[in-house]
């Protein structure tokens, strides 16, 4: 990807200093919650916990399989969040967690909750550590977003498994190296993972190939099972590693696939803007540079514009123009892949279907408060902002546009 346009940094700010600085409220269809129904609907409020970990503790305490609990979306642990879950059986929170996880039954539904029922999210955020001299720039960017919106890129939360050399675990898998894929899944730490967990994964990384020792350092039943099987193999083949990857929960395999689709879509969109001679700036992200168009360029992208996220049934059967197909092939080639990887899912039990995604998003009810003294940073300012976004749109990407240093 040619980076002819300039790079831009960001204005000074801190986000998520406390969970209360990042408040998220899930929005469901107005007619979904009823007075009667097969499924009970609960409001789940949490702070400092991600959704899946909270559900695991709730399911264990309630003696209910986690697969019996429906939810419409996952929420970050570095936030104070309110969302909804469904179950046909009563649910409760462990007593020791009631200060950080609250669960209230609020009604019933005729169907279990799923991601298709997530209408969007309402956000209330606090930006801290702001410089007085940069307030004018923030206000200017606020006006630009209110008028022009922002580009609907996937943000870093989508890529929790990102490696500096291999990028995503699934990329080596596509290239026939299932062993490296498995190694990354088992040994590459997540951002924010505790030191003890990171140290254990480092030990597994160093011991890789010594399956008996790896088995001793295993923590979960799945890890023990994987290393036990490898110990029995005299010469594991790529098929051996591939079959072992299929033992991971469907949720984890789905994340491997969806993060790949998201990465390709991000780079696809940026490359299209550049090929259309858009003016603007690049920003640096964990997964690589992304292009933010300037005002005149972004206004040429209709709010109704959708660009399919690449996937099954393959790029030639999707509604791409010839130029878009050529651009997508270029992006895949830069990642060492051919277009055939998008014809079907690499895992038989997981779908990798294409779906429509809006390119440009206009936030609803976007408001900015007064700039006040920051109680956590003497001499600095803080400001409260609020807005609503459709499901699947990243609030942190809006913040990146709001805090962009370049005036575009």
UniProtKB/Swiss-Prot annotation:
Keywords, alphabetical: Isomerase, tRNA processing
One GO-annotated biological process of the protein: tRNA pseudouridine synthesis
Disulfide links within the chain: none
Record carries keyword Isomerase: yes
The TRUD domain, residue ranges: 149-362
GO MF annotation: an example: pseudouridine synthase activity
Enzyme Commission number: 5.4.99.27
PROSITE patterns listed in its UniProt record: TRUD, UPF0024
SUPFAM superfamilies cross-referenced by the UniProt entry: Pseudouridine synthase
Residue numbers annotated as active site: 76 (nucleophile)
Top-level taxon of the source organism: Bacteria
InterPro entries, per database record: PsdUridine_synth_cat_dom_sf (IPR020103), PsdUridine_synth_TruD (IPR001656), PsdUridine_synth_TruD_CS (IPR020119), PsdUridine_synth_TruD_insert (IPR011760), TruD_catalytic (IPR042214)
Reactions performed catalytically: uridine(13) in tRNA = pseudouridine(13) in tRNA
Biological function: Responsible for synthesis of pseudouridine from uracil-13 in transfer RNAs.
Similarity field: Belongs to the pseudouridine synthase TruD family.
Protein name listed in UniProt: tRNA pseudouridine synthase D
Species in which this protein is naturally found: Leptospira interrogans serogroup Icterohaemorrhagiae serovar Lai (strain 56601)
Gene from which this protein is expressed: truD
């Amino acid at each position: 990807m040619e980076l002819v346009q300039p790079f831009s940094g960001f204005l000074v700010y801190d986000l998520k200093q406390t969970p209360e600085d990042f408040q998220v409220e899930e929005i469901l269809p107005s007619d979904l919650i009823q007075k009667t129904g097969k499924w009970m609907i609960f409001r789940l409020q949490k702070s400092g916990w991600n959704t899946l970990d909270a559900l695991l503790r709730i399911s264990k305490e309630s003696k209910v399989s986690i697969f019996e609990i429906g939810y419409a979306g996952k929420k970050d642990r570095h936030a104070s969040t309110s969302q909804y879950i469904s179950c046909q059986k009563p649910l409760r929170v462990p007593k020791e967690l009631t200060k950080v996880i609250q669960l209230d039954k609020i009604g019933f539904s005729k169907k279990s909750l799923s991601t298709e029922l997530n209408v969007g999210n309402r956000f209330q955020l606090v930006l801290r550590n702001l410089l007085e001299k940069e307030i004018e720039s923030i206000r200017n960017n606020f006006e630009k977003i209110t008028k022009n919106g922002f580009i609907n890129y996937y943000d870093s939360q989508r890529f929790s498994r990102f490696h500096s050399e291999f990028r995503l675990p699934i990329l080596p898998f596509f290239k026939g190296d299932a062993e490296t894929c498995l190694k990354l899944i088992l040994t590459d730490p997540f951002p924010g993972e505790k030191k003890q967990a990171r140290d254990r994964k480092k030990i597994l990384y160093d011991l890789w190939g010594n399956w008996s020792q790896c088995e001793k350092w295993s923590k979960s039943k799945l890890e023990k099972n994987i290393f036990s099987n490898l110990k029995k193999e005299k010469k594991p083949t790529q098929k051996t590693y591939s079959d072992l990857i299929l033992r991971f929960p469907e949720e984890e395999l789905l994340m491997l696939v969806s993060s790949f689709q998201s990465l390709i879509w991000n780079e696809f969109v940026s490359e299209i803007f550049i090929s259309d001679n858009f003016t603007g700036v690049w920003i640096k992200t964990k997964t690589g540079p992304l292009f933010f168009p300037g005002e005149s360029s972004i206004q040429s992208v209709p709010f109704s514009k959708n660009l399919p996220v690449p996937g099954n049934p393959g790029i030639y059967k999707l509604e791409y123009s010839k130029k878009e197909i050529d651009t997508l092939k270029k992006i895949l080639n830069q990642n060492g892949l051919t277009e055939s990887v998008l014809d079907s899912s690499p895992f038989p039990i997981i779908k990798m279907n294409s779906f429509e995604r809006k390119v440009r998003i206009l936030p609803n009810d976007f408001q900015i408060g007064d700039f006040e003294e920051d109680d956590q940073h003497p001499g600095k300012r803080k400001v409260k902002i609020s807005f609503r976004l459709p499901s699947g749109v990243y609030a942190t990407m809006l913040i990146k546009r709001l805090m962009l240093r370049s005036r575009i």
